[in-house]
């Protein structure tokens, strides 16, 4: 590696008050948001309208299933078959697409299922920014505009002169989603309400809605059909058609509130958030809301693409988790009962295996009040379900992925002194979840100090034994840190001991973490670059480094700093062969490093721990400049509910939380000459790197340490 030329980096923390420019939003940050980033390749994002952390994600659906269309939208497609109110951002499993509307002129185009009623469209007639989406439906010459409040979606259709109709399809389902039952009832000539119940990734999902049209419909047709499963009727599939006679340029607004609780809850949400037919008013309010959020981090740069990538990353990091309680505080719990969040907001859509790494640590600085409510949501979930969430949304635990990663989110919040959540209840929930002997090998983990690959339980069908051992060890460390701070020495000692279990799957003969059976024998014919059922979405190279809580211990385990440096270098230089068939999640590859999936995200920063800071800086800059682009295919892997973007936000600011609960941030290399992080307590953290550019990425020491 060449001898680095160094730039000067200054880290400044100063106390200031909120400035007038922050309140006036003289900079329109939404203009730097490109919601189409991630809608191509493997990003799995959607371009539609949403308020920050909003319950409603109002976005177009292409109408076709498939892994590329998990978000409902895939940039290479050329059809739109509806605009639905719920979506998942960047996940690897598909669900939701609830309450789907489609405007048409008569006669309309209908294809065989699954596409159904649809229209062609062109990207030349499509635009979007934070809180807004627009497209012209080519086949009907209808212009569609979308915006959203937290719990409501507002659509504005501009029609030609024609006999027109608006379809509401509660039968439509894609990917893992399946309609169980649905219902529509007419309140008056402009108001309807109903529900859609479904099964899929989210089990027994309930979505209720209330919709108001700005113009009375002339006629309504209901198409209902029985839903039959195993020769038994389980519900009704409903499609409604609302007819209108429209003039050239006439606009009809469709305002819809949703609720997980009841039609009455949806009606309250609509009345509270969208009481009138005024698209521009609510668009302006949501745009202002996004500007407040995006303006929490200011950057100065002459590179427009870098600013778009950065503010789009902040935007994507604030898509999830999502608000789940109604305006009156009611929400539907995992116990299938209605509960009340009094004085706080209940949140859902927690992709914790992904987001505990960077997204939630970022929230502790940009969203401390929401973090408090998220922890309260975890505690409530535990009280209603008997364990903390793993991957939950819309009142359902999916049990997707591994670990008990609500724990680091809770511990980080507690150790930073955030909020007024009940720490005693929170710690009790963490300890109880970590001691569920019949859940995903935890009992064997406690008994043997690792999870054997040859023993399964009812929750362990996917195996992933090696990865679970490493993830549990990290989560146990987080419990220990929280207990230690609370003065609970017995709990702390127990879980500090458990946090060392990562050493039990290290094989000195191969110098890799390696699966073991219940007799303690390491699996035979182990190849670190193989993708096997024992390692979660990764290979032995990628998961080896998942010891974020004890990097010094890992260094010693492999034989010291020199050996560690050799192994870490090999991670980035041992490239897959051209004949290797890599799985979907192995993308953004640099050697064996896979930036497209989360287990690799902290690895670049491990060079700091052995004094090779320049290598951290080199690879951080390489990833930021080569794997994040201002284009639809601009993400190299699943967005994963904000984690992919949160990595970029932290790294662009010049630091990253390798161990998310340590309060320690490894210094990388900033992307911008000046960055200001405005904190909720009125302080501003400023990073200055006045000479930074693509060829000048290495920094002189800002402190005597490689971290802050």
Spans of model-derived segments:
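Positively charged n-region of N-terminal signal peptides that target proteins for export
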Residues: 1-5
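Sec-dependent N-terminal signal peptides
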Residues: 6-10
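C-terminal motif of bacterial Sec signal peptides marking the signal peptidase cleavage site
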Residues: 15-17
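Accessory carbohydrate-recognition regions in carbohydrate-active enzymes
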Residues: 23-360, 364-408, 414-470, 478-504, ...
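ATP-dependent phospho-/nucleotidyl transfer catalytic cores
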Residues: 475
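Single conserved hydrophobic/aromatic residue that forms the stacking wall/gate
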Residues: 697-701, 705-708
């Amino acid at each position: 590696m060449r001898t680095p030329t160094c730039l000067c980096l200054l880290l400044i923390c100063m106390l200031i008050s909120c400035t007038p420019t922050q309140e006036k939003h003289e900079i329109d940050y939404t203009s730097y948001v490109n919601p189409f980033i991630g809608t191509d390749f493997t990003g799995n994002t959607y371009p539609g309208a949403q308020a920050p952390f909003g319950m409603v994600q109002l976005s177009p659906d292409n109408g076709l299933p498939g892994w590329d269309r998990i978000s409902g939208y895939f940039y290479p497609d050329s059809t739109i078959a509806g605009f639905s109110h719920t979506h998942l951002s960047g996940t690897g499993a598909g669900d939701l697409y609830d309450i789907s509307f489609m405007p048409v002129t008569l006669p309309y185009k209908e294809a065989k299922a699954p596409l159904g009623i649809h229209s062609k469209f062109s990207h030349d007639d499509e635009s979007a920014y934070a809180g807004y989406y627009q497209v012209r439906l080519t086949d009907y010459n209808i212009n569609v505009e979308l915006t959203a409040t937290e719990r409501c979606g507002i659509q504005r259709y501009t029609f030609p002169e024609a006999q027109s109709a608006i379809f509401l399809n509660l039968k439509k389902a894609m990917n893992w989603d399946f309609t169980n039952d649905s219902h529509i009832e007419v309140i008056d000539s402009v108001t309807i309400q109903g529900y859609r119940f479904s099964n899929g990734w989210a089990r027994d999902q309930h979505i209720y809605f209330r919709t108001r049209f700005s113009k009375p419909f002339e006629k309504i047709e209901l198409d209902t059909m029985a839903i039959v499963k195993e020769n038994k009727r389980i519900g009704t599939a409903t499609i409604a058609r609302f007819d209108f006679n429209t003039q050239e340029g006439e606009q009809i607004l469709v305002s819809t509130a949703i609720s997980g609780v009841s039609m009455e809850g949806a009606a309250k949400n609509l009345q509270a958030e969208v009481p009138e037919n005024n698209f521009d008013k609510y668009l302006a309010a949501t745009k202002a809301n996004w500007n407040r959020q995006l303006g929490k981090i200011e950057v100065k740069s002459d590179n427009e693409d870098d600013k778009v990538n950065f503010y789009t990353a902040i935007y994507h990091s604030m898509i999830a988790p999502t608000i789940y309680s109604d305006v009156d505080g009611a929400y539907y719990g995992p116990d299938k009962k209605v509960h009340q969040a009094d004085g706080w907001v209940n949140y859902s859509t927690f992709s914790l295996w992904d987001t505990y790494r960077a997204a939630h640590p970022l929230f502790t600085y940009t969203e401390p009040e929401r973090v408090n409510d998220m922890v309260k949501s975890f505690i409530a979930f535990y009280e209603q379900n008997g364990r903390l969430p793993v991957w939950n949304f819309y009142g359902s635990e999916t049990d997707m992925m591994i670990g008990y990663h609500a724990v680091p989110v809770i511990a980080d919040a507690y150790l930073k002194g955030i909020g007024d959540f009940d720490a005693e209840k929170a710690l009790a929930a963490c300890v109880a979840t970590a001691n569920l002997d019949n859940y995903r090998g935890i009992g064997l983990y406690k008994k043997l100090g690792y999870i054997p690959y040859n023993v399964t339980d009812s929750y362990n069908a996917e195996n992933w034994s090696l990865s679970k051992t490493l993830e549990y060890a990290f989560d146990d460390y987080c419990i220990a840190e929280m207990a230690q701070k609370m003065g609970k020495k017995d709990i702390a000692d127990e879980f500090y001991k458990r946090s060392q279990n990562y050493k039990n799957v290290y094989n000195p003969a191969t110098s890799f973490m390696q699966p073991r059976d219940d007799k303690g024998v390491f699996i035979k014919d182990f190849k670190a670059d193989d993708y096997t059922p024992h390692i979660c979405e990764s290979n032995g190279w990628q998961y080896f480094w998942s010891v974020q809580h004890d990097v010094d211990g890992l260094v010693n385990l492999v034989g010291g700093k020199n050996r560690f440096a050799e192994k870490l270098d090999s991670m980035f230089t041992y490239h897959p062969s051209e004949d290797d068939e890599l799985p979907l999640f192995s993308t953004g590859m640099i050697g064996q490093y896979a930036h497209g999936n989360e287990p690799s995200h902290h690895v670049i920063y491990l060079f700091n721990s052995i004094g090779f800071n320049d290598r951290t800086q080199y690879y951080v800059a390489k990833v930021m400049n080569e794997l994040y682009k201002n284009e639809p295919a601009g993400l190299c892997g699943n967005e994963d509910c904000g984690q992919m973007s949160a990595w970029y936000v932290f790294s662009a600011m010049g630091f990253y939380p390798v161990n998310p609960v340590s309060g320690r941030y490894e210094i990388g290399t900033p992307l911008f000459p000046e960055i200001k992080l405005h904190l909720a307590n009125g302080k501003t953290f400023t990073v200055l790197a006045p000479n930074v550019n693509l060829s000048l990425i290495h920094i002189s020491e800002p402190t005597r340490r490689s971290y802050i």
